[in-house]
């Protein structure tokens, strides 16, 4: 098939509403370590700085800024502690377990697109895929379980450097288009 175009989607905030999952897990994670629960505006303001795409790092940064702003002597938690707390809130258990065992905030997510969108794109010779900072189990859950997509083209956490680095987008575009992008060597 000769493609007429290519669309690479983010997942969070584009394919699924994560305000009652990732964002809620961020709020509750921060609260569990410093007793302060940031607002959605606090979270958005930090995300808008452009470097806090990873919610674990975002949570840690919110804790650090709060404790500094309030002159607290609280020692920030280790990143591993943030990951463990966040994961328990978000998944409700281990993310590698079967989806049916998940009981966390991930169950609150609503789909923002019509399930037929991707077949419509394919029918119109438009290639598509996903580039997300989400963990692989979370990304696959929404794409395969909620949207019923079979092996969707996906670059997720750990597959490429974190956004805003464009490497994940470039790699997936090259794979889908089957040619190298960029300037000639």
Question: Which stretches of residues belong to each language-model region?
Answer:
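Non-catalytic pre-domain segments flanking phosphatase-related domains
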Residues: 1-9, 68-80
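Active-site neighborhood of HAD-like aspartate-dependent phosphohydrolases
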Residues: 1-45, 51, 57
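Short, acidic loop-to-helix structural element flanking the phosphoryl-transfer center
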Residues: 3, 8, 88-130, 134-144, ...
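Hydrophobic alpha-helical core bundles mediating ligand binding, dimerization, or RNAP-core interactions
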Residues: 22-26, 30, 63, 138-143
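Generic non-transmembrane alpha-helical segments
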Residues: 25-33, 85, 89, 101
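Helix-loop "lid/cap" segments that line or gate small-molecule binding pockets
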Residues: 27-33, 56-72, 172
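Alpha-helix termini
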Residues: 67-73, 118-119, 174-184
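Substrate-recognition "cap/lid" segment bordering the active-site pocket of phosphatases
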Residues: 129, 134-185
């Amino acid at each position: 098939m000769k493609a007429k175009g290519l669309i690479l989607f983010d997942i969070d905030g584009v394919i699924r509403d994560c305000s009652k999952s990732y964002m809620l897990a961020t709020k509750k994670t921060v609260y569990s370590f410093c007793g302060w629960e940031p607002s959605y505006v606090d979270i958005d303001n930090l995300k808008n700085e452009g470097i806090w795409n990873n919610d674990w790092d975002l949570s840690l940064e919110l804790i650090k800024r709060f404790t500094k702003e309030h002159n607290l002597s609280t020692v920030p938690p280790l990143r591993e502690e943030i990951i463990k707390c966040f994961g328990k809130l978000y998944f409700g258990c281990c993310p590698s377990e079967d989806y049916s065992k998940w009981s966390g905030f991930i169950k609150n997510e609503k789909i923002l697109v019509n399930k037929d969108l991707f077949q419509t794109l394919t029918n119109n010779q438009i290639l598509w895929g996903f580039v997300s900072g989400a963990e692989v189990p979370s990304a696959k859950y929404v794409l395969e379980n909620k949207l019923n997509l079979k092996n969707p083209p996906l670059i997720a956490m750990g597959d490429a450097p974190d956004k805003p680095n464009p490497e994940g987008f470039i790699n997936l575009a090259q794979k889908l288009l089957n040619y190298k992008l960029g300037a000639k060597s």
